[in-house]
UniProtKB/Swiss-Prot annotation:
Joins adenosylcobinamide-GDP and alpha-ribazole to generate adenosylcobalamin (Ado-cobalamin). Also synthesizes adenosylcobalamin 5'-phosphate from adenosylcobinamide-GDP and alpha-ribazole 5'-phosphate. This is Adenosylcobinamide-GDP ribazoletransferase. The gene is cobS. InterPro entries: CobS. It is a multi-pass membrane protein. The chain crosses the membrane at residues 42-62, 68-88, 118-137, 144-166, 180-200, 201-221, 237-257. GO terms for biological process: cobalamin biosynthetic process. It catalyses: alpha-ribazole + adenosylcob(III)inamide-GDP = adenosylcob(III)alamin + GMP + H(+); alpha-ribazole 5'-phosphate + adenosylcob(III)inamide-GDP = adenosylcob(III)alamin 5'-phosphate + GMP + H(+). Keywords: Cell inner membrane, Cell membrane, Cobalamin biosynthesis, Magnesium, Membrane, Transferase, Transmembrane, Transmembrane helix. Its main location: membrane. Its cofactor is Mg(2+).
């Protein structure tokens, strides 16, 4: 066997696993049953996010070239990223808002989060999520800066997921998050490094630092809420974390875009 072949195969396998779990891209990998495979592959989540961001940026660029306004181009870019991911993270955000906002007991909150129907809290959360991201992209306007912002947001938002999974215990023993297991330290470190690198290259050191601080604070608040109300994290909580990350990074990019 050629030296390094097994390592390359593992990297490719992890990339396919990550992409298959957070996108609808035809990567040729079904959800794996091997123990520890999902947790190990979490390092590749920011890489999968980078691909999603690039797809949204491409649509924004094409829309701008066709003469569409920044508002319409931003809307199409968001629609593209939602289609590629199957609105997986948006669904998690809505379920989290409904569960944490609507249930009185831990059991009822978890029951609501598993319900496929969407409630008032979920609708409001989705409106705010799409509205804030749409407004941020439209404010940035410049196609090149939008590309950098989308890549940074989708990459960094997923880069924190392994750490969140590692630090916050599963809320129930039978959920997807519990079955995946806690990511090993190596996966957490690689994901963080990839996310930080992309964020820094895309937005610059200053804005990247602001984004990391705000994203960490948002993650701590969400973790505290999840532990207090339902005893830990679920797949829906992870989706809400990703959406929060996108919003934070895009708002940072929009707020400081004039300073580039």
């Amino acid at each position: 066997m050629i030296p390094g072949t097994e390592t390359i195969r593992n990297v490719i396998a992890d990339l396919r696993i990550a992409a298959s779990f957070v996108t609808l891209l035809p990567v040729g990998s079904s959800k794996p049953a091997a123990d520890g495979a999902i947790a190990r592959a979490t390092w590749a989540l920011p890489v999968a996010g980078l691909l999603v961001g690039l797809a949204g940026a491409l649509v924004y660029k094409i829309s701008s070239r066709l003469g569409l306004t920044p508002n319409l181009a931003a809307l199409l870019a968001l629609a593209t990223t939602a289609l590629i991911t199957g609105a997986l993270h948006e669904d998690g955000l809505a379920d989290t808002a409904d569960g944490l906002g609507g249930g009185r007991t831990r059991e009822r909150k978890l029951e609501i989060m598993r319900d496929s129907r969407i409630g008032t809290y979920g609708v409001c959360a989705l409106i705010l999520s799409f509205g804030l991201r749409w407004s941020a992209l439209a404010a940035i306007a410049n196609p090149w800066l939008v590309t950098l912002a989308l890549c940074a947001a989708h990459c960094a938002a997923r880069a924190g997921v392994p750490a969140f999974m590692s630090l916050v215990p599963p809320a129930r023993p039978d959920g997807l998050s519990a079955s995946a297991g806690a990511p090993p330290g190596r996966s957490v470190a690689i994901a963080f490094a990839v996310g930080t690198l992309v964020l820094t290259l895309a937005l610059g050191p200053g804005k990247a630092l602001v984004g990391l601080i705000l994203l960490s604070l948002a993650g701590l608040i969400l973790a505290r809420l999840a532990i207090r109300q339902i005893g830990g994290q679920t797949g829906d909580i992870l989706g809400a974390f990703e959406q929060t990350g996108e919003i934070v990074i895009l708002l940072v990019a929009a707020a400081f875009q004039m300073g580039r």
